[in-house]
Amino acid sequence: MIRIAAALCFLAVAFGAFGAHWLKAQLEERHMAEAWHTAVLYHLIHAIALFVLAYFGTTNRGAWWLLFSGIILFSGSLYLMALSGMRWLGPITPIGGLCFLAGWAWLVISPPKL
């Protein structure tokens, strides 16, 4: 789990740089620069949370998988919409947001034993 979390952190930083340099003009032309930035921000925040949970060997695997799913669905759908213009992916984004909320709620109800 820690390797997955570390890879997700790596990808968040890489996608941030990719969007800021190589994709900047394309994203601005499509009016998707803000969506890309939001995707990177939420991706990185939740990847760090996954890393911390994995590092401390938490037994909250449900919360871990919900946060992981949130990255895939929320940030992933925004990345794909920004790159492809496929607006039909829009309804997937809030499902990812709900996964984030559910993962954090799980941690509130059942905090990890660090």
Q: What kind of region is each of these model predictions?
A:
Residues 1-114:
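Polytopic transmembrane helical bundles with strong interfacial aromatic enrichment
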